[in-house]
């Protein structure tokens, strides 16, 4: 929402929902909710919170390219390239991060921490403490 408020261009916002099971089984990725607009011949910007292995994003980009947009550009807040398994083009990256589990600013762990106004690192001890609550 912060990003959208700071873009001073006419745009149409669409949301997609992608499901993935496991990190290395690309065949277990599927689109649960697709864009509701015809994107043929139109520029598309994909906004991602975090790009990790790149497998889901690669699937998404192939899915969108099949709809023949004029261009597809990816903007990612966080890039965890150390875990990359699929080469994906990132047009814009906010921050490169190490291989740590991050939470806050929309990122969650078990439905928790998504509402934090900042991004933090979840240490290995914290999930155990949450499970005991």
Per-region residue spans from a language model:
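PRPP-associated nucleotide enzymes
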Residues: 1-133
């Amino acid at each position: 929402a912060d990003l959208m408020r700071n873009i001073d261009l006419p745009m149409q916002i669409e949301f997609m929902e992608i499901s993935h099971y496991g990190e290395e089984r690309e065949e277990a990725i599927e689109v649960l909710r697709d864009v509701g607009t015809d994107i043929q011949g139109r520029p598309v910007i994909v906004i991602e919170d975090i790009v990790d292995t790149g497998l889901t994003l690669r699937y998404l980009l192939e899915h969108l390219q099949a709809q023949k947009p004029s261009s597809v550009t990816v903007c990612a807040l966080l890039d965890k390239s150390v875990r990359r398994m699929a080469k994906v083009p990132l047009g814009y990256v906010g921050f490169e991060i190490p291989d740590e589990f991050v939470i806050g600013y929309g990122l969650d762990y078990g439905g928790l921490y998504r509402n934090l106004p900042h991004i933090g690192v979840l240490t290995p001890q914290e999930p155990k403490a949450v499970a005991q609550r």
